[in-house]
Regions:
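STAS-typified acidic loop motif
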Residues: 2-39
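General structural signal for secondary-structure boundaries
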Residues: 11, 63-65, 114
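Amphipathic alpha-helical interaction surfaces in cytosolic regulatory modules
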Residues: 25-106
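Short acidic-hydrophobic, aromatic-tinged amphipathic segments that line or gate anion-handling sites
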Residues: 105-115
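A short, charged, amphipathic alpha-helix used as a generic interaction element across diverse proteins
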Residues: 115-122
Length: 122
């Protein structure tokens, strides 16, 4: 599992990868974001890693680079015919994601448990 990351905590639950970005969505180095996104995308290509849940419970804000990184991971999973979603966003984050129409592409679940269950449902 990916344990050396600074921005994301990565967990695997059955065939679902749960990533939890932590801290300030603008308080990171671009190189770290790019490197970690690529590491997670590589992990998602491995057998047994099909679905993706992005847990936003620790985020209050993120900038365009961060959104782009999340979208690249979500899109890759969806393009392979697997499930991807968001969960646990606060009211401010929900507004940002709704304004960007991202929920038309990937659903949002109120709790992490709901998201993991939905992702794993065949």
């Amino acid at each position: 599992m990916l344990t050396h990351l600074k921005i994301f905590v990565v967990e695997q639950i059955s065939e679902t990868i749960v990533i939890t970005p932590g801290g300030d969505g603008n308080g990171f180095r671009y190189n770290d974001l790019h490197s970690e996104t690529n590491a997670i995308r590589g992990h998602l290509m491995k057998p047994g890693s099909k679905h993706l849940v992005v847990d936003l419970s620790k985020m209050d804000y993120f900038g365009s680079e961060f959104i782009g990184a999340l979208v690249s991971m979500l899109r890759e999973v969806k393009n392979r015919g697997n499930k991807a979603c968001f969960c646990s966003a606060n009211a401010q984050m929900l507004g940002v994601l709704q304004n960007m129409s991202l929920f038309k592409l990937w659903p949002h679940y109120v709790t992490r448990d709901e998201a993991v269950a939905a992702a794993g449902a065949e």
